[in-house]
Amino acid sequence: MLEFFSRLSLVTKIIIAIILGIGVALLFPTVTPYLSLFGELFIKALKSVAPILVFVLVLSSIANFQVGHSANLRPVLLLYVVGMLLAAFSAVIASLSFPSTLYLNTVSHNNLQAPGSLADILKNLLLSFIANPVQAISEANFIGILAWAIGLGLAMRHSSDTTKQVMQDVSHAVSAIIHKVIAFAPVGIFGLVAVTFADAGLATLESYAQLLAVLLGTMLFVALVINPILVGLTIRGNPYPLVFKCLKESGITAFFTRSSAANIPVNLDLAERLGVNPSTASVSIPLGATVNMAGAAVTITVLTLATVHTLGIHVDLATMIILSIVATISACGASGVAGGSLLLIPVACSLFGISSEIAMQVVAVGMIISVLQDSTETALNSSTDVLFTAAVDIRSRQNS
């Protein structure tokens, strides 16, 4: 039996864990207090690895970033950044229009102070940026961690190849540890689902359904409205034939592999069939699999604002714009590990003074809905890589 279960994919295991958790909560509610330990251990494990994960992944990706010599690379990068920012803005609007409430253990947020004016937020942001790096990691100050990772990464871009390789090896090692933690996600999710449904009942299903609807609806909006607008402005023509071709031939594959990196060969093959210059595609598509994460920006923004709404924190427009920028920067590091966007939610939550403990509960909620969220997110991310690359190449041919 154990051997059969071990052969199942992580998605299948999570689905089974959710079904078992709901069943135990409804049929044997008195047992659920004993199952809470599984969920607590899982959240604790996520809390312990998240700070070093963010630091190492961002540092390594920036230090090893190679710009290349393709003239078409700069406009592709510009589309990547603009696309992620617009995706985050879309997520803000969707979250305001359809606010979601999460079921969280918020006992520890009694001392939580809502951010004041924009000046207070910027002041706290700047103070977080210049935190001691060791203290930032130990106290899970994700803004400080991000600042030091970016700074060191930029400085190490001029270091030797050996040093860069060491950082990449450390990044792979940390990712391997994360994979081990994620492997226990079904057990943790089983405990979390059982306790949540025992406490809140079937109303929890409605909460998760609305959260999923906001997430998936926003990603579809980005894929079918935002991206076509950007591509249409680039190629100065009807973008939809190219959009649908990329969604069909790249997005569907990425949906099932749930990995932008694994979808790189598919995208390179599609780019070749679209007649894209190989010198552009060979750089922009692997780079896109690393930094172009519009779906991750949506996930980080929606789940952060759902947390803010749940805790009753008032947020003004200026703060939401800052959140969109932070979500975009955070999303660039989401490719380091499967479900990486969820593990970067604490970075955005720290903007609002939300504790790491509560943020990790949100990560656990994300794990529960990740069966659909992560697949759709990857489909959007990966199909956008080849879409923007092809659009810039078409524009280049038009100008030549």
From Swiss-Prot:
GO molecular function: amino acid transmembrane transporter activity; symporter activity
Signal peptide (UniProt feature, chain positions): none
GO cellular component assignments: plasma membrane
Keywords, in A-Z order: Amino-acid transport, Cell inner membrane, Cell membrane, Membrane, Symport, Transmembrane, Transmembrane helix, Transport
Cell compartments where the protein resides: Cell inner membrane
Top-rank taxon: Bacteria
Family annotation (InterPro entries): Na-dicarboxylate_symporter (IPR001991), Na:dicarbo_symporter_sf (IPR036458), Ser_Thr_transp_SstT (IPR023025)
Membrane topology: Multi-pass membrane protein
BP terms from Gene Ontology: serine transport; threonine transport
One Pfam family this sequence matches: SDF
TM regions (residue ranges): 14-34, 48-68, 76-96, 136-156, 177-197, 211-231, 285-305, 311-331, 349-371
Reactions accelerated catalytically: L-serine(in) + Na(+)(in) = L-serine(out) + Na(+)(out); L-threonine(in) + Na(+)(in) = L-threonine(out) + Na(+)(out)
Function: Involved in the import of serine and threonine into the cell, with the concomitant import of sodium (symport system).
Family according to the record: Belongs to the dicarboxylate/amino acid:cation symporter (DAACS) (TC 2.A.23) family.
Full protein name: Serine/threonine transporter SstT
Species assigned in the record: Acinetobacter baumannii (strain ACICU)
Gene that specifies this protein: sstT
